[in-house]
Amino acid sequence: MGFFKDKTVIITGGGRAVLSDGSCGSIGYGIATAYAKEGANLVLTGRNVKKLEDAKEELERLYSIKVLPVQADISASADNEAVVKSVVDKAIKEFGHIDVLINNAQASASGVTLADHTKDQFDLAVYSGLYAAFYYMKECYPYLKETKG
């Protein structure tokens, strides 16, 4: 442990999802675990508060790091710049800097073929993935530039 000690990492879609066999199946949670093992403090975003709180509880217990869970939903009906600015402002207030940004979040209409997608289902995928990455990169850039992240 130690490569990312005292570094701050924002991971979108970092909540803890439990599979039917009891294991954790979220890619974001796997990424969070890898950074936690190296001593990074984490800002985890997602739509589901319970998954974020579960991730915070477990990662802090196992790795003695700090985790800031922030509910954030980038969608067609949201003021997405304000949502992302709020996340980044909370990260800076809590940790003072941002060293790494992982744009992991991506929602989709599971089990629906592309041909059967509605416009709303397609918007969900585009906003949660493409637009979220754009807004997070834009808002985090000055802090990442400062820390050479």
Model segments located where?
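N-terminal Rossmann-fold cofactor-binding loop
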Residues: T45-V49
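Substrate-binding pocket helix/loop in short-chain dehydrogenase/reductase
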Residues: V112-L114, T118-D123
